[in-house]
């Protein structure tokens, strides 16, 4: 039977025998192909009917191929630098904006200082323009080959492969186990930079050997690489793991409570402001605040399914021969509140929200400042409603998301994830629920991308991604429909005809984790919070000791009006105090001396401007208005 291959936007190819992709390409610029939805190498063989799309350097998948090849060049360079017999290879995939490779260096290690030497070796490999070859062989032969090369990690990977045929890629004397695809030659990749080296357990398991992971970035054009490196430098300056402790917002004591941040008075002020802002809006939108236990019995977690599916991420304690778990999620607690009294169709929708502290075990190797922790607070809410109410409820949540994100100056985007292959519930209910999500987003004019078959097994969902001030995106809010929990817990409401019906449950969080959201805000604002969020909103700087009394008088007026204010009474120069206040990102610095005391005024400075002498009354009015309206702008500049 002839093989028929439809070429996207370019007719059809018919062959009487299996054919390699490179035999049917019609341009020298093609680097890979997509066959029946799968990214493949040009040297791959087609032996069945299907549709092929060619990937050139302008295709959206080109960076993945480019970066994957760069990871092999990195591995080859490391073997050249440290000696082939001293290097054991782990894995080396392409990742977003870059690539990495894991190594075990026998009798040595890779240091940050070594990266420049490795880069130079990579450039030599690129200059040689070595052809990249694809090799097919049996799994047994590949195991023998890698055993002979003393590559135990590759042997382990090979033994896990189900197919009897595997692929390897060769460039010069370097050979690696890999599915591909790769660029046709090493000379086709040029613009790269090695970024860092860190530890990484083999397969991410702490029981396995610790390898060394070298990270790099690569782009098709030099300008893109430069822009990305500039972004990384700006992100480094904004890193919340440095700014947070420097601004006395939080710290983490890894000897006492790894992954569990400790918030100072400054950090606590910010978190309380975030919660109060959210609380006010939730009440406005018809939510009722609840508080549920931190520790609940094994029985509850078995019923919810967490015991079966989430046990490895939970913390436990046993008392009086009964096992308890510290809650990793708030939903079972909210279900208890719902079940506490009978619910009629007239009562629906019911909306509960809670600033619930949860604990989830994370491996120490993945902990990352406030972004990946073991203890955090969720702005968690659950809505119980009828299926015909879903659209309106989702629209209400989207509006609430908009109100909250706009307050911080965030743009955002949305994704709709639909029914996966493995799902519970009938398809008709899924379709109705998914359509309700679509209509809700469209009714409020929210643009979205559809992620086919990426919903949870218990319901479709909407994810929101915020974009920060330097263009990075962060997944924060989630709206999740759930058909499973109401069924597991036997949730019901009395319908109009007096019969019991099962409600739909909507899980949603907007900040997501308050701690993570705070980390995002620190980096978004580079620590310079808008006045309403700033831990210290005003600092008063007396020029000399004789001005302390007037400084206290000014402070008293601000405190009475709800402003967070301090006096810098240190025996330092005014210039030093101003520089220190600016380094601590305090929004307003009010300098007071003889002239100000005589005229009931203050000399006003902000983080970037000097407004000179202004009446205390005017300054107080501007600052209190700025705080009350939660303005992102400095109102003194208006």
Curated annotation (Swiss-Prot):
Its EC number is 6.1.1.3. Its cofactor is Zn(2+). One of its GO terms (biological process) is threonyl-tRNA aminoacylation. Residues 239-530 are annotated as: Catalytic. Its main location: cytoplasm. PROSITE patterns: AA_TRNA_LIGASE_II, TGS. It catalyses: tRNA(Thr) + L-threonine + ATP = L-threonyl-tRNA(Thr) + AMP + diphosphate + H(+). The keyword Flavoprotein does not apply. Keywords: Aminoacyl-tRNA synthetase, ATP-binding, Cytoplasm, Ligase, Metal-binding, Nucleotide-binding, Protein biosynthesis, RNA-binding, tRNA-binding, Zinc. Binds 1 zinc ion per subunit. It is found in: Cytoplasm. SUPFAM superfamilies: Class II aaRS ABD-related, Class II aaRS and biotin synthetases, ThrRS/AlaRS common domain. InterPro entries: aa-tRNA-synt_IIb (IPR002314), aa-tRNA-synth_II (IPR006195), aa-tRNA-synth_II/BPL/LPL (IPR045864), Anticodon-bd (IPR004154), Anticodon-bd_dom_sf (IPR036621), TGS (IPR004095), Thr-tRNA-ligase_IIa (IPR002320), Thr/Ala-tRNA-synth_IIc_edit (IPR018163). Belongs to the class-II aminoacyl-tRNA synthetase family. Homodimer. PANTHER family: THREONINE--TRNA LIGASE, CHLOROPLASTIC_MITOCHONDRIAL 2, THREONINE-TRNA LIGASE. HAMAP family: Thr_tRNA_synth. Catalyzes the attachment of threonine to tRNA(Thr) in a two-step reaction: L-threonine is first activated by ATP to form Thr-AMP and then transferred to the acceptor end of tRNA(Thr). Also edits incorrectly charged L-seryl-tRNA(Thr). This is Threonine--tRNA ligase. It comes from Pseudothermotoga lettingae (strain ATCC BAA-301 / DSM 14385 / NBRC 107922 / TMO).
């Amino acid at each position: 039977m002839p093989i028929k291959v439809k070429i996207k936007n370019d007719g059809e190819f018919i062959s009487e025998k299996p054919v390699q992709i490179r035999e049917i390409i019609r341009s020298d610029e093609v680097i890979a192909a997509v066959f029946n939805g799968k990214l493949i190498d040009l040297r791959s063989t087609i032996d069945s009917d299907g549709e092929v799309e060619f990937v050139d350097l302008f295709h959206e998948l080109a960076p993945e191929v480019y970066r994957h090849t760069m990871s092999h060049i990195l591995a080859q360079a490391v073997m050249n630098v440290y000696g082939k017999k001293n290097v054991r290879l782990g894995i080396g995939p392409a990742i977003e904006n870059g690539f990495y490779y894991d190594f075990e260096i026998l009798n040595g290690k890779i240091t940050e200082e070594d990266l420049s030497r490795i880069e130079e070796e990579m450039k030599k490999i690129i200059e040689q323009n070595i052809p990249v070859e694809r090799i097919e062989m049996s799994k047994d032969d590949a195991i023998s080959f890698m055993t002979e090369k003393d590559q135990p990690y590759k042997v382990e990977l090979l033994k896990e492969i189900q197919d009897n045929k595997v692929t390897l890629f060769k460039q010069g004397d370097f050979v690696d186990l890999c599915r591909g695809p790769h660029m046709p030659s090493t000379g086709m990749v040029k613009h790269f930079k090695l970024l860092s080296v860190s530890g990484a357990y083999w397969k991410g398991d702490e029981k396995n050997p610790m390898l060394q992971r070298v990270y790099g970035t690569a782009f098709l054009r030099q300008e893109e690489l430069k822009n990305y490196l500039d972004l990384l430098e700006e992100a480094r300056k904004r890193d919340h793991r440095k700014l947070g402790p420097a601004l006395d917002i939080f710290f983490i004591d890894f000897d006492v409570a790894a992954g569990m941040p400790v918030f100072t008075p400054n950090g606590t002020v910010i978190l309380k402001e975030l919660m109060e802002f959210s609380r006010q809006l939730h009440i406005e939108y018809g939510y009722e605040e609840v508080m549920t236990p931190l520790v609940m019995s094994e029985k509850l977690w078995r019923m919810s399914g967490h015991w079966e599916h989430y046990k490895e991420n939970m913390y436990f304690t046993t008392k009086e021969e009964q096992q308890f778990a510290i809650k990793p999620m708030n939903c079972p607690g909210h279900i208890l509140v719902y079940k506490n009294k009978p619910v009629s169709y007239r009562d629906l929708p019911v909306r509960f929200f809670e600033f619930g502290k949860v604990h989830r075990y994370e491996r120490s190797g993945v902990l990352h400042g406030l972004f990946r922790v073991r203890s955090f607070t969720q702005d968690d809410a659950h809505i119980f409603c009828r299926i015909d109410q879903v659209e309106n409820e989702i629209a209400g949540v989207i509006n609430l998301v908009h109100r909250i994100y706009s307050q911080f100056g965030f743009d955002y985007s949305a994704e709709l994830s639909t029914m996966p292959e493995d799902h519970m519930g009938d398809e008709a209910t899924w379709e109705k629920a998914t359509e309700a999500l679509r209509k809700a987003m469209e009714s409020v004019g929210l643009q979205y991308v559809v992620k086919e078959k990426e919903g949870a097994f218990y319901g479709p969902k909407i994810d929101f991604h915020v974009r920060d001030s330097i263009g990075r995106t962060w997944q924060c809010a989630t709206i999740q429909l759930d058909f499973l929990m109401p069924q597991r817990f036997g949730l019901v409401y009395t319908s109009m005809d007096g019969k019991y019906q099962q409600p739909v449950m909507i899980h949603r969080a907007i900040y997501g984790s308050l701690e993570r959201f705070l980390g995002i805000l620190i980096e978004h604002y580079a620590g310079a919070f808008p006045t309403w969020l700033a831990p210290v909103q005003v600092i008063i700087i007396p020029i000399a000791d004789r001005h302390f009394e007037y400084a206290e008088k000014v402070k008293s007026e601000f405190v009475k009006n709800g402003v967070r204010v301090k006096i810098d009474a240190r025996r330092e120069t005014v210039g030093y105090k101003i520089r220190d206040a600016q380094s601590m990102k305090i929004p307003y610095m009010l300098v007071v001396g003889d002239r100000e005391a005589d005229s009931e005024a203050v000399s006003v400075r902000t983080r970037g401007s000097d407004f000179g002498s202004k009446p205390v009354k005017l300054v107080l009015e501007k600052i209190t208005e700025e705080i009350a309206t939660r303005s992102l702008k400095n109102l003194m500049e208006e």
